[in-house]
Amino acid sequence: MKRLTILLIYLLIFVGCATTKGPPPQEFGGKPDVFCNVIQKPDPLLMGTWESRFLRTVGKSRADDNYVKYRLIKRDDKYGLYFYRTWRDGRKKKAEWKNWTINGKEILGEPRQFGVKIFVQGKDVYFTIRALDKPAKMSRVDE
């Protein structure tokens, strides 16, 4: 009888845990606290969340694994861009809302000296940055 009681208690705990809702997942980036400069409204393909992985050569020969992810949303009549990037094999990270420039089919990063650009070519979205041999094709992230 004691074993049956213990078994029932465990069963009730597991059922209770399975039906309890946890907190809703945080949206990637949360809410914008800064907005983009818009010259021309963004191509609809740029909207939403996109990501890419690519190798970039550092120095003369060392390959550096990079990851980039962004989320472009519209709030009222403004556009917010949350940008997340890792480099130096994940040891360096940057994640923040950006006040970059949107000009139709492209988003230009600031300061321009880093050469960050997200752009539409055909039906695809690409990312490029200084010292990257060729643009990295991005993949849409289902939210």
Model-predicted regions and their roles:
Residues 2-10, 14-58, 141-143:
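Amphipathic/hydrophobic helical signal segments and adjacent flexible N-terminal regions
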Residues 46-47, 71-80, 102-106, 117-125:
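Short, solvent-exposed coil/turn segments at beta-strand boundaries
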Residues 57, 83-92, 113-114, 130-134:
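Short, solvent-exposed aromatic-acidic interface loops
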